Amino acid sequence: MITILIVDDEKLERRGIRFLLKREGDFQILEAANGKDALGILASNHVDILFSDVKMPYMNGLELTKAVREDHPEMEIVIFSGYNDFSYAREALRYGVVDYVLKPVDPNEFHKTFQRVMENISSKEEKQKQQNRKEDYLKKYFFLRYLYSGKEEDFVQLEKLTDETEDDVSQFSRMVLVSASNCLLYTSPSPRD
């Protein structure tokens, strides 16, 4: 489930954003009254999307965005502001926010912004799935090459792609050989012997 954090010092504004989010779908929604509280929530919760006001006590939205980018570069961020000040918008864009929305928030504009955020998340998830498939393919490829050839360079490639140690790979190799009891396989000694 997507987790969203709304950060605004005005409770009424947080309720308004929560209402608009409920129209978009079912999400886990967290709230904070300022940037400092938001960092505390982020330290103990995985958050996918951050909606933040600019002007808040203790830590403003731009300071929060900068801090979030350092620890959570993948997070989608939308900034809300009652100030039509280009310098705020420019700084927000420099930190990679998806959008800078002026208050009062127009529901249609919010919907378009939210759709863009969800498209970004879907795109990142799809890229991660593709990357995982490629890594799985390469692991299998180099493992089979190592099993058939016993060459050290194939083993080195396999080690680079996996977190497993040489002992783990050797144990798995023996398991494959045992399961292939009907086949005659030749294995060379470990490349490190």
Task: Annotate each predicted stretch with a short phrase.
Residues 1-3:
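Extreme N-terminal starter segment of soluble prokaryotic enzymes
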Residues 32-36, 191:
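Conserved Asp/Asn-Gly motif in the active-site loop of CheY-like receiver
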Residues 26-33, 41, 89:
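Short hydrophobic/Thr-rich beta-strand motif most characteristic of the beta2 strand and flanking loop
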Residues 105-188:
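Interdomain helical linkers/hinges and coiled-coil/dimerization scaffolds
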Residues 39-134:
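CheY-like receiver
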Residues 7-8, 32, 50, 187:
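Conserved sequence signature across two-component system core domains
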Residues 11-30:
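Two-component/phosphorelay signaling modules centered on CheY-like receiver
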